[in-house]
């Protein structure tokens, strides 16, 4: 088995010291702006790339209806997470955020209320994006796993649809995951222990603190060990077909049966993508001898998630992809696993 040492391993927990930081909401807004991004996107489906500059300058900020208090903007969320990552890993290289958005909400200023949409001038139109996701990589912390270079990565997701903007200012919901990105394909490797799906915050400073705590508790070495373990097992074509068939069947099971099986969030369209890429994927397709490693199987799922998930479900499905793959691997080892149903 490959060594599980992370290179380099040195970092200092920053939670206590960072609590003394003040005015974090102001300092993080001036994060360096992305001017051009030629990297492969970490999520593709139903989303478009945007720069931090555009988020800051071209988008309005929604308010809570009953007290007119502003929400935490997308750029503030990105800035708080970016600053926490820089402070936690002080001696490492931190890449610029890669940002994706979807579900644009358009509006107009009051003076243009009676104009037709075709008559609106640029300064009379407003917009913001309901959903936003960003990815920040740390390329100096990496590990080679099953022949692929993985680099440390943090992903944040925000959907204003999760907040009650019709009420008064209250804690807003954010999701953050720390894990790895496969540099071969830019698939995210998210583990449930590095994923916080319901962070509540009313200021960028609170997001900053939540991010530091998540980074401090994340067990990087164990995550790498689990990912490496997937390379030790192989699926025959018959086993692969059986598992995909059970995945298709899962969502149609009677509730009494489904309750006895661990949750699976892989959709029918994702299953179709995995089947299609079984022979076609340049990096993770079946070998000439007809075998597919569980590592390759896992990456086919994360690739399908990258190409087929909406922003607001992206992290849930990515984390579930690893949970499901590890569970099936346990079943293949004849261990007591609730996932045995998928291979029997």
Positions of predicted regions on the chain:
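A short acidic/basic microdomain associated with nuclease active sites
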Residues: 88-134
